[in-house]
Structures are given as C-alpha cells and as structure tokens.
A protein has these predicted regions:
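Long, compositionally biased, intrinsically disordered segments
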Residues: 2-252
C-alpha cells in the first residue's frame, strides 16, 4: 500500500549564523496505540518536537534530567497556545482535546544556539475521525525569504480509519529531521530527509502548501517562495539547494 508524507509537516532551516526571533522549526507526528483495537474511543499518541533559539528559550542539562518543560522566557503566550483543530473540526474530530505546545526540554547546545523540546500526549478519538490540527504562530528567527509576516503553520492530519489490506488502523509516516542544518555557501548541497513508516508502506514526500483542502500547512514559508532560486525539491524527500550568501536563513 502506497502512502505519502501527508500527515506530517516537517519544517527545517538552513543556517550559517544565529540571531533573531526564537522559532527554528519542528515536526508533529502521531501513532495509534493499538492498531488492532476495536470500538471507540481509539487512543492516539501525538508527539510534538520543536527547535528554538537558545538563550531566548531555556533548556539546561538539569532540566533535561528532570524532564522539565522548556523555559519560555518572555514568550509566555506559549502557555496558552494549543495544537488546535484547523480543518474538519466537530463531527470529524470527536473526542479531540488539543494538547499544549510547550514541550519538555530534551536537547540543548549553546554552541549551535539551539534548544530542542518534545512532548507526547494521548488523545482518545472516535472511529472514522479525520481532521487536521496545527501549531500556528509568527516568531520565526530572521529569515531571508518569506511572505507576509513570516508566520508558520505546522500541521498534521489525523485519520482514524482501518486499512483495507489488513483491517488494522493506519499509522502516519514520519520525517525525523530537526533544524537547523548548515550548508556551505555557493556550493550545491543535497539534503536527504529521513523518513519512515511503521506499517512498512512505500512513502513519498508531498511538500507543504498554503491551501491543501483548506489547511495552511506552512504559513509564510511555503516552498518554492521560501527557498533560493534554482532550489529543487523532489517527491523522494530530497532537496538540492545552494546558499547564495553567508548568513542567510531559509525555511521549508
């Protein structure tokens, strides 16, 4: 059975220096707790992983050891920000209670100016639910190319339907790359995005758009406008990109 990376929006940056606002990208994935479950509700684990600018979003080794939430600093609005339903809400998202987006501190590098956090939440959904949820905001670190205010929208589509080939619930494929990435200036670089599917399906990358069945998947950083001229993105999850100027940042 073929599948596409439709459920996961992976956002990453290509970087030479670090400065500016606090968000560096992230991923949202989900999996069925018991693929052979019968009846409702169906338990689903949603995992959010985000990368932030170190110094503005706090993480320490002690916080990692204590499984503490990241320190949001002046960005206290994050405490009231949730992974809200953004499409097919209501009858197609029965039982969904949106989790908060503030993650537990998992990794930190002062040298790379990066804080990474992750959280997993279990939600109980109804059979045949099919909806999209997203983390939306507008505090990207300074980017070279973007539209509007440089907002982001990291979305995931959650579908609670059994497969026709084996009668089990399907799990979402995942992309496991985190930002930021470094690329050399004026040299074409091939980036292969790591992807996996726990059901063993053949998967491809469908790159995000601003209006996929009514869902904004990328905000102000939708490709190709967010990338340098002559960047090529392929459905096999490969990007060929050339950084034109030292210090440029791009998002996809």
């Amino acid at each position: 059975m073929k599948s596409t990376v439709f459920f996961v929006l992976m956002v990453f940056e290509l970087i030479n220096t670090a400065s500016g606002s606090h968000f560096l990208g992230g991923t949202i994935t989900w999996r069925i707790v018991n693929a052979s479950a019968t009846g409702s509700p169906v338990s689903v684990v949603i995992t959010q992983t985000y990368s932030w600018l170190y110094g503005l979003i706090t993480c320490t080794n002690a916080m990692i050891a204590g499984s503490q939430l990241i320190g949001v600093g002046v960005f206290t609005n994050l405490y009231s920000t949730y992974l809200n339903c953004v499409a097919n809400c209501g009858n197609d998202s029965r039982g969904y209670i949106a989790p908060n987006v503030v993650p537990h501190c998992t990794d930190v590098s002062a040298y790379l100016s990066t804080t990474i956090g992750q959280r997993s939440d279990t939600v109980n959904l109804e059979v045949d639910d099919d909806f999209a949820a997203a983390f939306k905001s507008n505090a990207w670190r300074t980017l070279t190319l973007f539209t509007g205010t440089g907002s982001w929208s990291i979305s995931t589509r959650i579908t609670i339907k059994k497969r026709s080939d084996n009668g089990l619930y399907n799990n979402a494929p995942v992309a496991t790359m985190m930002s930021p990435l470094n690329i050399p200036v004026l040299k074409p670089t091939i980036i292969n995005v790591p992807i996996a599917d726990m059901d063993g399906d053949i998967i491809r990358c469908r790159w995000s758009t601003s209006n996929t069945t009514g869902v904004d998947e990328c905000g102000g950083v939708c490709p190709p406008d967010s990338l340098p001229i002559n960047t090529v993105i392929y459905p096999n999850c490969t990007i060929i990109i050339t950084g034109p100027v030292v210090g440029n940042w791009f998002a996809v």
